[in-house]
From Swiss-Prot:
Subunit-level organization: F-type ATPases have 2 components, F(1) - the catalytic core - and F(0) - the membrane proton channel. F(1) has five subunits: alpha(3), beta(3), gamma(1), delta(1), epsilon(1). F(0) has three main subunits: a(1), b(2) and c(10-14). The alpha and beta chains form an alternating ring which encloses part of the gamma chain. F(1) is attached to F(0) by a central stalk formed by the gamma and epsilon chains, while a peripheral stalk is formed by the delta and b chains.
Family that this chain belongs to: Belongs to the ATPase C chain family.
Cysteine pairings via disulfide bonds: none
Membrane topology qualifier: Multi-pass membrane protein
Gene: atpE
Name this polypeptide is given: ATP synthase subunit c
MF-aspect GO terms: lipid binding; proton-transporting ATP synthase activity, rotational mechanism
Originating species: Aeromonas salmonicida (strain A449)
């Protein structure tokens, strides 16, 4: 019974990491596409758009880093 619990914890951590990676990839690709679209429409607003792009990209990329920390806690803290 203990092995099943450990396997489920490892499986949950793997699902967390996979979904975080997919979510970040989709979010950053959508953000990059909208950035290029906005830069093509308004070239004079490029510096403002670039600043906003990097701020929001950092926020989008922060969520998978939090999930990595949670998954590592599950693997090494709870399952150990």
């Amino acid at each position: 019974m203990e092995n099943i619990k450990m396997e489920m914890i490892y499986f949950a951590a793997a699902i967390m990491l996979g979904m975080a990676a997919v979510g970040a990839a989709i979010g950053i690709s959508l953000l990059g596409g909208k950035f290029l679209e906005g830069a093509a429409r308004q070239p004079d607003l490029m510096p403002i758009l670039r600043t906003n792009f990097f701020i929001v990209m950092g926020l989008v990329d922060a969520i998978p880093m939090i999930v990595v920390g949670m998954a590592l806690y599950l693997i090494f803290g709870v399952a150990a």
